[in-house]
Design a protein with these regions (language model features):
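A short, charged, and often flexible helix/loop element on the N-terminal side
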Residues: 5-31, 73-80
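A short, histidine- and acid-enriched strand-loop-helix "catalytic/donor-clamping" loop
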Residues: 17-19, 35-38, 49-50, 63-80, ...
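Glycosyltransferase donor-sugar binding loop
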Residues: 124, 149, 173-185
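A short helix/loop element that forms part of the nucleotide-sugar donor recognition site in Leloir-type
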Residues: 129-140
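A conserved mid-protein helix/loop that constitutes part of the nucleotide-sugar donor-binding site
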Residues: 144, 153-167
């Protein structure tokens, strides 16, 4: 048992198998939560949400946060895609509440599952004044660039951004910044 800023962290050991790690981890974490004395289990993402029916069998309240439609991501295929869609359906059918991060995701659940969701968008507390010194390091000026900031993965459609930028008549520079996904791609 570890503690981080007043939050207890409980480790759930799983076998080291890339292909099944997420499924096995979700199962073991759910079983541990079932017997941990918790009133509510909060599942993050579609894959872990496949375990919601198990938790409901034990009378637990379940909240699921859907961060995106993971099954649409290019890194998944075959069984993983089907499992993620299964988890999405289990969340829609059995979760007490579903949290989504955008209006489009909220509409997706309404259209696809006739399911109401709670939208809580990601946000930040912007600094009162921005430090513009990093701009000069890259030859950029305030309001002189178009910025993409996010994971650099195929499903973000950065190639469409580049194609669209090439058609613009602008003096603004295109800046693409971000990291890769946690996948091996």
């Amino acid at each position: 048992l570890h503690n981080l800023d007043g939050v207890q962290i409980r480790w759930v050991p799983t076998p080291n198998s890339k292909k099944l790690n997420a499924i096995v981890y979700s199962f073991f974490a759910t079983v541990r939560a079932l017997f941990g004395g918790y009133d509510i289990i909060h599942f993050h993402a579609e894959g872990p949400a496949a375990m919601v029916p198990l938790a409901k069998c034990f009378g637990k309240k379940c909240v699921v946060t859907i961060h995106g439609l993971d099954w649409q991501r290019a890194k998944w295929g075959g069984f993983a895609t089907r499992f993620l869609r299964f988890g999405e359906r289990m969340a829609a059918k059995y979760a007490d509440e579903i949290i989504v991060l955008s209006a489009s995701m909220q509409q997706y659940f309404a259209d696809t599952y006739h399911r109401q969701t709670v939208r809580i968008e990601n946000g930040i507390d912007p600094p009162e004044t921005a430090d513009l010194s990093p701009l000069s390091r890259f030859g950029l000026e305030k309001d002189g660039y178009i910025l993409f900031l996010g994971r650099i993965v195929p499903e973000k459609g950065i190639h469409y951004l580049i194609d669209a930028y090439r058609t613009l008549q602008t003096d603004k520079k295109l800046v693409i910044a971000g990291g890769a996904s946690h996948s091996e791609e």
